[in-house]
């Protein structure tokens, strides 16, 4: 409640920043806070491979997003103050918007994202039951090896992704590998496409670790 009130104050003070924030809870702490009620599909992430996709399983995620880094920073400070000793910050990542909404790989990210606030609500917000108004968050932090990527030809990069790099056009299904990123994430259930709202941004430093969060 304290953080929500502080967030509302910042939103009123900086309307042009289009500020928003989400507080999400991991499976274990949510079961404790809710008494086991709701969030039936909330589960711990199962790690994949030897370090390829580790499971961190943090208890709380605070995601802050706006058009101004200074506002984001101030809201993050307010969040830490509001939660106080009840949390111990394990990781703090600052993302940024890159050229033409592209990932550091040079490809446009989130092309198929649902457009418009109402459509996004329809896709992501739970409508009924004890979880009404809530949602699920799936967090992945990718580390990019851009040197290795840039050793590939643009054509090979496009075949790997499933879209053209400059024009951001989808490559026909028959012309792209079944192992391409686009082919793997084009999921359907009962013939209907499964949609998510992506909020990913590039992050990191030029001389150190960088990628997509």
Feature map (PLM): residue ranges:
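Long, histidine/aromatic-enriched segments associated with O2/redox biology
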Residues: 1-213
């Amino acid at each position: 409640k304290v953080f929500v009130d502080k967030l509302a104050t910042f939103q009123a003070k900086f309307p042009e920043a289009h500020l928003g924030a989400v507080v999400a809870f991991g499976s274990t702490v949510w079961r404790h806070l809710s008494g086991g009620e709701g969030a039936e599909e909330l589960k711990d992430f199962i790690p994949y491979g030897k370090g390829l996709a580790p499971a961190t399983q943090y208890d709380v995620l605070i995601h802050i997003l706006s058009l101004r880094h200074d506002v984001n920073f101030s809201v993050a400070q307010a969040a830490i103050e509001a939660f106080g000793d009840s949390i111990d910050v394990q990781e703090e990542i600052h993302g940024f918007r890159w050229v033409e909404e592209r990932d550091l790989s040079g490809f446009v990210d989130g092309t198929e994202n649902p457009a418009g606030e109402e459509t996004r609500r329809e896709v992501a917000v739970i409508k009924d039951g004890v979880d009404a108004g809530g949602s699920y968050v799936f967090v992945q932090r990718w580390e990019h090896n851009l040197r290795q990527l840039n050793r590939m030809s643009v054509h090979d990069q496009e075949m790997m992704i499933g879209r053209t790099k400059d024009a951001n056009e989808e490559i026909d299904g028959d012309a792209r590998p079944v192992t391409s990123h686009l082919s793997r994430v084009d999921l359907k259930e009962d013939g209907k496409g499964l949609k998510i709202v992506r909020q990913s941004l590039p992050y990191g430093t030029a001389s150190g670790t960088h990628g997509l969060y």
